[in-house]
């Protein structure tokens, strides 16, 4: 029984710390004290037995054990396995180029089974999982890669992509910032960080529209209303609209003149856009930013 006393002492220490927290009611604290007394009685341990104390608190030992649970010791990998694993990684990379993402996942998984301490394999599998929209699995693989190599910037970058796809923009920003800390000159991380930051601002805004371009502000803008009214009073626009209505109810077709009418509408629309640009340029800039943000890329980086 003496061999387990350090463990029991650590448990008692943990329970005593918990009993002193305000998070518990008086009855719950009393129950913790009873548990402590029972353990001390059964294992014949007292608070004075400080020689039984270990260097790490019980919670820290538990956390470290959980983090390392999925990673087998490096000694399990032999040179032959490492070489075969690298070949499987290359096969997986080829499948990625061919957009055969399921096959790529299979190759990377086999590589991990042979060499479970290679961060690159987890990170590459994360990229394939993201392509399959398996974002939760992609994040888990990135976390495993980071657990092996905490300075692996690509793992943080790919985690940011998966988090962004899941609309977890705040976490994505953190991942991209960490990636940039490790690789400050990476343009892909810079670009994706800006996109994630923009998305975060959108979902945090009072309107909650999720759009960079505020259509409500445009419609309610007095300058826009005035310009829209001016456009509708344009004789060319009125003539074209009249012709369209006539055709819609079965009137004579516009014939060759339809091209001229369409050209007139385009010209009137261009004039309208120029007026908005001159009188309210910030709305045009919002629209441009919205269009740019829609072109969010899932990264074009090469695989390791």
UniProtKB/Swiss-Prot annotation:
This is Small glutamine-rich tetratricopeptide repeat-containing protein beta. GO terms for biological process: post-translational protein targeting to endoplasmic reticulum membrane; protein heterooligomerization; protein homooligomerization. One of its GO terms (molecular function) is identical protein binding. It comes from Rattus norvegicus (Rat). Belongs to the SGT family. The modification Phosphoserine is found at residues 293, 295, 297. Homooligomerize. Co-chaperone that binds directly to HSC70 and HSP70 and regulates their ATPase activity.
């Amino acid at each position: 029984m003496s061999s387990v006393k350090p463990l029991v002492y650590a448990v008692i220490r943990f329970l005593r710390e918990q009993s002193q927290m305000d998070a518990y009611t008086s009855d719950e604290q009393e129950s913790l004290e009873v548990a402590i007394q029972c353990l001390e009685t059964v294992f014949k341990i007292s608070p004075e037995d400080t020689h039984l104390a270990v260097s790490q608190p019980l919670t820290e030992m538990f956390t470290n054990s959980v983090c390392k649970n999925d990673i087998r010791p490096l000694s399990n990998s032999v040179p032959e396995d490492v070489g075969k694993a690298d070949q499987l990684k290359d096969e997986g990379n080829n499948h990625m180029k061919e957009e055969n993402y399921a096959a790529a996942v299979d190759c990377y998984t086999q590589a991990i089974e042979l060499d479970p301490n290679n961060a690159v394999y987890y990170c590459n599998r994360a990229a394939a999982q993201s392509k399959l929209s398996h974002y939760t699995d992609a994040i888990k693989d990135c976390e495993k890669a980071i657990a092996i190599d905490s300075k692996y910037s690509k793992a943080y970058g790919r985690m940011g992509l998966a988090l962004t796809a899941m609309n977890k923009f705040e976490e994505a920003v953190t991942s991209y910032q960490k990636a940039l800390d490790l690789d400050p000159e990476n343009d892909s991380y810079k670009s994706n960080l800006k996109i994630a930051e923009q998305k975060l601002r959108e979902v945090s805004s009072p309107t909650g529209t999720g759009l960079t371009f505020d259509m409500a502000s445009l419609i309610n803008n007095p300058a826009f209303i005035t310009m829209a009214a001016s456009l509708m009073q344009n004789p060319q626009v009125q003539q074209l609209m009249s012709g369209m209505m006539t055709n819609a109810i079965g009137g004579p077709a516009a014939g060759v003149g339809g091209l001229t009418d369409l050209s007139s509408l385009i010209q009137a629309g261009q004039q309208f856009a120029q007026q908005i640009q001159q009188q309210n340029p910030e709305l045009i800039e919002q629209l441009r930013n919205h269009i740019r943000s829609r072109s969010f890329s899932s990264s074009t980086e090469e695989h390791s």
